[in-house]
């Protein structure tokens, strides 16, 4: 009877140990894989923020320096085109500068997500603020794009004449600024997607 009790107790103890250890090993393996995956996304996030900063600063600087004066003038008139002649372009410069400033300030939080890829709070904060920056950036770029279109093509229904034949440099700079702004919009949209994917549970 003693040998029978020993034969029955030993397998029971070994099976309980196996059942207790197996899930822990599986969880540890999944945890490590998820951390490496999210760290890779965080590094990509940081690089995209640098690209978005460059695009936003280029857009704001180009629009802010768009100024052209025609070489001919009359006794009472001087023909000049500048971004501050149009409130839409003024809004563009201010809004894109705000977006660029936010992106610079967001870099430390992006670094935190690289060091601690499983941290939820900084990633959630970046998701909310990136969405707000994306909305502001899109509004500024879209409004400026409408004015640039009118500058190139005019509007015959309202007798608005195109001015780009006379102010070629001005139109070239404003068009380049709008293109750079939409590039930053694209980068921000990708950042929002990355933040959403990073918050997804493994």
Curated annotation (Swiss-Prot):
Residue intervals annotated with topology Extracellular: 62-90, 152-176
InterPro entries: CASP/CASPL (IPR006459), CASP_dom (IPR006702), CASPL (IPR044173)
Bilayer-spanning residue ranges: 41-61, 91-111, 131-151, 177-197
Record GO terms (molecular function): protein homodimerization activity
Compartments (UniProt record): Cell membrane
Pfam families given in the database record: CASP_dom
GO cellular component, one term: plasma membrane
Keywords: Cell membrane, Cell wall biogenesis/degradation, Membrane, Transmembrane, Transmembrane helix
Keyword check for Membrane: yes
GO biological process assignments: cell wall modification; cell-cell junction assembly
Cytoplasmic side: 1-40, 112-130, 198-202
Membrane topology: Multi-pass membrane protein
Similarity comment: family membership: Belongs to the Casparian strip membrane proteins (CASP) family.
Purpose: Regulates membrane-cell wall junctions and localized cell wall deposition. Required for establishment of the Casparian strip membrane domain (CSD) and the subsequent formation of Casparian strips, a cell wall modification of the root endodermis that determines an apoplastic barrier between the intraorganismal apoplasm and the extraorganismal apoplasm and prevents lateral diffusion.
Subunit structure and binding partners: Homodimer and heterodimers with other CASP proteins. Interacts with CASP1, CASP2, CASP3 and CASP5.
Name by which UniProt lists this protein: Casparian strip membrane protein 4
The encoding gene: CASP4
